[in-house]
Amino acid sequence: MYLRSRAIVIKNMDYRESDKLVTIFCEHEGKMKAVARGIKKPRSSLRACVQPFCHSSLFFSRGKGMNLITQGKLLDFYGNTREDFERSLYALYLMELLDKSLMEGVAIPRLYTSTLEVLSHLNHSGYNPMLIRYFEMNLLVNLGYSPLLDHCVLCGKKDDLKVFSLPDGGMLCRDCSYQASGAVSLSKETLALISLLGRSRLATVERVRVSNKAQKELEYFLEKYLEYYLERKFNLKKAMSILKRSMPRY
């Protein structure tokens, strides 16, 4: 059986002497793994098509065993991102999020499209913290983990909302907050940003001005929310934190 699909390359790893095992996020087939044979050979025509976070059109041979990539055409290499260490690190973080959160064989077309959108903006416009926060929230929404912000998830009250409960996935009112575990306090600005991320287009999100305090609070909240519901730790978050601390301030 033969298959052709547009795909975002999540990662690749050594597989036998001259092959690589490639993990990809396909437009209609979802996440899958396939072998790229002879990819380590200097003249391999597939080499550029299966690099992490590139966008390619791939041809597969599917059988009872492992899927094989037989041909490929590079659609976008995101060269500006690859030439910039910081941007590359963030692009790889997006791929780590996909790899650790997606089940194989489950198509999520909207997430596929938004991933391409974020990679394109990162490549052409440079790094913007809200770009990454947009992707994190978009991932959660597409996986069915949208945070509930407009009412208390325990009693339904819509006013006097006090804290966000990670185990309950939403806000708690003052009365219910006393029995909460894993609660996170969020400012009004941060709550507004979370709501904006969940319902707005990327172009709108990128134009929003955010205070440093709310930016840090938003990043912390989404990090803990992702870790709680995806039950994963994301290694590149630590690397990015180290990078931020080491960068000069002017």
UniProtKB/Swiss-Prot annotation:
Name this protein carries in UniProt: DNA repair protein RecO
Family matches, as Pfam families: RecO_C (PF02565), RecO_N (PF11967)
Gene Ontology biological process terms, A to Z: DNA recombination; double-strand break repair
Gene: recO
UniProt superkingdom: Bacteria
Family: Belongs to the RecO family.
Physiological role: Involved in DNA repair and RecF pathway recombination.
PANTHER family documented for this protein: DNA REPAIR PROTEIN RECO
Keyword tags: DNA damage, DNA recombination, DNA repair
Gene3D superfamilies, per database record: Nucleic acid-binding proteins, Recombination protein O, C-terminal domain
One GO CC term, this protein: bacterial nucleoid
